[in-house]
A protein has these predicted regions:
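Conserved S-adenosyl-L-methionine
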Residues: 156-264, 268-280, 286-291, 302-303, ...
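Catalytic core segments in nucleotide and nucleic-acid processing enzymes
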Residues: 283, 295-298, 725
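Hydrophobic alpha-helical scaffolding
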Residues: 106, 131, 213-217, 261, ...
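Conserved, well-folded catalytic cores of nucleic-acid-processing
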Residues: 18, 123, 144, 148, ...
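Non-catalytic, mostly N-terminal accessory regions of nucleic-acid modification and defense proteins
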Residues: 1-178, 239, 243-248, 351-354, ...
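Conserved Class I SAM-dependent methyltransferase catalytic core
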Residues: 11-14, 18, 24-37, 238, ...
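Hydrophobic alpha-helix feature that most strongly marks membrane-spanning transmembrane helices
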Residues: 229, 233, 267, 310-313, ...
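Conserved P-loop NTPase
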Residues: 366-407
Length: 799
């Protein structure tokens, strides 16, 4: 039976992290990813005579498994596994598996490498059918590990990885797709790191295209080569060297080679960029700086950008991550920026949230370059996407809704207030070619201004009510239902009591109509997609499946006011990532029969796909209510016992002399009291104590009986559940999973979103009503009243 993907990756990381010991994560990643590489090519290509990757005899992952627990395991991995594969495929810079400083020596090394190999023996890590089934185990596992390695590597060593969310945005807005690409289409990254950006662009093409990358770090370049093979791009060309001083991709005439698409996340503000660069030569007609200007000596941002411009074909397009400073810094950079804009090469600028990238917290932007129709370009499309993100540990991450919104708005060139607009070249020229986004897009939230007149004389300013116009558009008569004109112009008065605001809003006919409309939209989406969900089978591609569902949900909520379609979309995608994704992959792997399976942990069990609660709700609600009643009775008895014990504890209490209060000690005490009463039958205190002790014992007996009934009833319900799971039909499983689990959860999040929207209106009206409810005159009168009372009290006290 397949393991859930989330469980697989989490356990994979936990095992790796445990084995790392004192080694830096940026180093340990090299060993883990080489192991992943060997496992992948062995599963994928071993025994295939015409495979794109050559695996010499005796160098497969199974040959590595045979080396476990052998004294020379490190040397043998180098000589028998890594060395032959590297030589056969012209790979270099592979990590040393016999390095004593990193892996220990003697028995310590043997244990560490044996355990590392064992991690990848997990049968669920089988890459034989990877991608062909639409289940990219390798790609997802790789992303998971790389993100964790980058997080653990710290500020100076995490730059080998561009966050997947940013890579996805770049790939989707650069302009490549399955229709406009062929095997000859080329994509290039001059600072490719581990190659994640290149791979995301290649994925958008949905076919094998020509991939090229250059990386200055030796080890990272080797990692990028492996990454290309791991992601089914074995023909990709990755070269090692300094892109600025020694660009290795050149045409037959020796000039900089050009490409259809370029993506890059170069090192920010690289100070020593000019080392080895022949600046006078680069200023010549064939040089990279010709017609633009020379970047400043201690800042390489524009050096990389101009290299990218030079690397673009006549109709080439690029997406580059650079720090915000490139948009507004002066002197040499201002000259270059002006020339780029005048030539029409800059197509768009997107401001990103701060702290997205590993290795730096500097705010960054995406610069979109496009040589196609550059001479006729009239403006630059600008976007401030800096506020859309979620916290993820000590970093920020783009959410699914942020990615989708950025891509939608940019590709369709939609102008959204406080978010995006097309800025004419004329306006940019008027602002001296300064591209600082706040100069063109004011994304600041409107200030909540306090109205002095309202504080002095009461009532609510009409300006505050007009700020809620998006609500009044949907509920046109609600405003007059809640407010009436004040005696003063420009002010209104609340017609109802503050405590009745929520009830009046939620029961208003227009609110009810809108709620019904939202429900109808969701119901239409549900009716359309329930059958699609129930049709999941072995040939289903989970990523295409969720794309269909999520796109349809976005489309469904596109024409509704108040509710943000991207918020609704995010709810679906969050549920997909937390639960639905695992369910879908299980169904693709094992079929709907996985709904019959249960998992045991100690003495408790749970459905592998269908939680017990869903089965109970649909089939055993009567039994569950009976159990809940018994549990309530048991809890009530426990509360009575606790209350009785608390009442009679303490030194003077009837239980005060007991070390512990339980059935045995109370029984013994009752015998003593009964004996004492034989000698003093009318002792009121003894009689009362006997009564309390007997009450305690009676409640204890009742509690024991209640516990027995709860245990017995729960066991009976568990037995029915255990019998029900294997007897569920496929149709019943589909109903439970799709309707009761997935659709019901998504529907609930949509309803909660509707509640939040309405609650914001309620809270705002309450806030305004409370703010101006008491005038300054009334406040001063109240202050004077209490001041006089205090004075009188002080006078009585002689002060």
């Amino acid at each position: 039976m397949a393991i859930k993907k989330s469980e697989l990756y989490s356990s994979l990381w936990a095992s790796c992290d445990e084995l790392r010991g004192s080694m830096d994560a940026s180093q340990y990643k090299d060993y883990v990813l080489v192991m992943l590489f060997i496992k992948y090519i062995s599963d994928r290509y071993a025994g295939q005579p015409f495979a794109p990757i050559k695996i010499p005899a005796g160098s497969t992952f199974q040959d590595m498994v045979a080396l476990k627990n052998t004294p020379n395991i490190g040397e043998d991995i180098n000589k028998k596994i890594i060395g032959p594969i590297a030589e056969a495929n012209k790979l270099s810079d592979m990590p040393d598996f016999a390095h004593p400083d990193k892996l220990g020596s003697g028995a310590d090394m043997v244990k560490k490498l044996t355990n590392l190999i064992a991690i990848f023996e997990n049968p669920s890590l089988n890459f034989g059918g990877n991608r062909a089934e639409g289940d990219d185990i390798l790609g997802d596992a790789y992303e998971f590990l790389m993100r964790h390695f980058a997080t653990e590597s710290g500020k100076s060593k995490g730059q080998f990885y561009t966050p997947a969310e940013v890579s996805r945005v770049m790939a989707k807005i650069i302009g490549i797709n399955s229709q406009n690409s062929t095997s000859e289409t080329s994509v290039y990254d001059p600072t490719c790191g581990s190659g994640s950006l290149l791979l995301k662009v290649a994925d958008e093409a949905e076919k094998l295209i020509s991939v090229f990358g250059q990386e200055n770090d030796t080890t990272t370049a080797g990692l990028a080569r492996m990454n290309m093979i791991l992601h089914n791009n074995p023909t990709a060309v990755v070269k090692h060297g300094n892109t600025l001083s020694n660009p290795l991709f050149r045409d037959d005439s020796g000039r900089i080679k050009t490409f259809d698409f370029v993506v890059a996340n170069p090192p920010f503000s690289f100070k020593s960029w000019s080392n080895g660069v022949n600046i006078p030569e680069e200023q010549q007609e064939s040089g990279r700086f010709y017609g633009y200007g020379v970047p400043p000596a201690k800042n390489g941002d524009y050096a990389f950008l101009l290299h990218i411009v030079k690397s673009l074909r006549r109709n080439g397009k690029a997406a580059v991550i650079l720090p915000h400073g490139v948009l507004f810094r002066g002197n040499a950079e201002a000259e270059i920026r002006q020339n780029l804009i005048r030539k029409g090469i800059v197509k768009g600028i997107i401001g990103l949230p701060a702290n997205l990238f590993y290795g730096t917290g500097i705010p960054a932007c995406l610069i979109l370059l496009d040589k196609e129709n550059a001479e006729s370009r009239k403006g630059v499309f600008m976007m401030d996407a800096g506020k859309g993100f979620a916290k993820d540990g000590n970093k920020n991450r783009l959410r699914e809704q942020d990615i989708h919104k950025i891509v939608d708005v940019f590709n369709k060139q939609i102008e959204v207030p406080k978010f995006s607009r097309m800025v004419s070249l004329t306006e940019i020229a008027e602002k001296e070619f300064n591209l600082n986004i706040p100069r063109y897009i004011d994304s600041t939230e409107s200030e909540d201004i306090q109205n002095i007149e309202a504080h002095l004389q009461g009532d609510i300013p009409n300006a505050d009510l007009e700020a809620l116009q998006h609500y009044w558009t949907v509920y046109p008569t609600l405003k007059n239902h809640l407010f009436e004109k004040s005696k003063r112009p420009d002010f209104s008065r609340l017609k109802i009591a503050q405590e009745d605001i929520k009830q009046n809003i939620f029961s208003h006919p227009e609110f009810v109509t809108y709620s019904n409309k939202v429900n109808a939209v969701f119901t239409a989406w549900k009716n359309k997609n329930t059958a699609i969900c129930k049709a999941i089978g072995a040939d289903t591609k989970p990523k295409a499946f969720i794309h269909t569902l999520s796109k349809d949900l976005l489309d469904a909520f596109s024409n509704l006011q108040l509710i943000d379609k991207y918020d609704v979309y995010q709810h679906l995608m969050t549920y997909w990532m937390e639960t639905m994704q695992d369910d879908c992959y299980l169904l693709v792997s094992d079929g709907w029969k996985v709904g019959n399976a249960v998992e045991w942990a100690k003495k408790e069990f749970e459905g592998r796909l269908i939680p017990k609660g869903l089965l109970i709700h649909r089939y055993f609600e009567t039994e569950q209510k009976a159990l809940e009643q018994l549990e309530a009775n048991r809890d009530a008895l426990a509360a009575q016992l606790e209350e009785l014990e608390e009442e009679h504890s303490g030194e003077e209490g009837f239980f005060g002399s007991l070390d512990k209060v339980n059935k045995a000690t109370v029984n013994a005490e009752l015998k003593t009291v009964t004996a004492d009463l034989k000698a003093d039958k009318t002792n009121a205190e003894l009689l009362e104590k006997k009564k309390v002790l007997e009450q305690y014992l009676k409640l204890s007996e009742e509690q024991a009986e209640a516990n027995r009934k709860v245990k017995e009833t729960k066991a009976g319900l568990d037995k029915k559940l255990q019998d029900k799971y294997p007897s569920l039909t496929e149709a019943e499983i589909k109903t439970l999973v799709v309707e009761d689990k997935w659709i019901a959860t998504i529907e609930n999040t949509v309803k909660n979103e509707m509640q939040r929207i309405s609650q914001r209106l309620t809270q705002r009206i309450k806030e305004l009503a409370e703010r101006y409810e008491t005038t300054l005159t009334e406040l001063l009168q109240e202050v004077n009243h209490w001041e006089e009372k205090v004075k009188k009290h002080l006078e009585k006290m002689g002060y």
